[in-house]
């Protein structure tokens, strides 16, 4: 039963990050979440359009 809730939590987290990424679009270069002793960091590596 616990794994079912953990799976739902991971799916909700992924959907939240995906939604946030779609909302901010091109202005997102780095996203960091710090929670007690856990740090989640996403960095977007890209080449600007010329």
UniProtKB/Swiss-Prot annotation:
One Gene Ontology CC term in the entry: plasma membrane
Membrane topology reported for the UniProt record: Single-pass membrane protein
Cellular localisation: Cell inner membrane
Coiled coil, from the record: none
Domain of life the protein comes from: Bacteria
This protein's UniProt keywords: Cell inner membrane, Cell membrane, Membrane, Toxin-antitoxin system, Transmembrane, Transmembrane helix
Transmembrane segments: 5-25
Pfam families registered for this protein in UniProt: HOK_GEF
Entries under InterPro entries matching the protein: Hok/gef_toxin (IPR000021), Hok/gef_toxin_CS (IPR018084)
Family the entry assigns: Belongs to the Hok/Gef family.
Biological role: Toxic component of a type I toxin-antitoxin (TA) system. When overexpressed kills cells within minutes; causes collapse of the transmembrane potential and arrest of respiration. Its toxic effect is probably neutralized by an antisense antitoxin Sok RNA.
Protein name: Protein HokE
């Amino acid at each position: 039963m616990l794994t079912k809730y953990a799976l739902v939590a991971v799916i909700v987290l992924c959907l939240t990050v995906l939604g946030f990424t779609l909302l901010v679009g091109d202005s997102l270069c780095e996203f960091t979440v710090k929670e007690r002793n856990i740090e989640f960091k996403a960095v977007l590596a890209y080449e600007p359009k010329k």
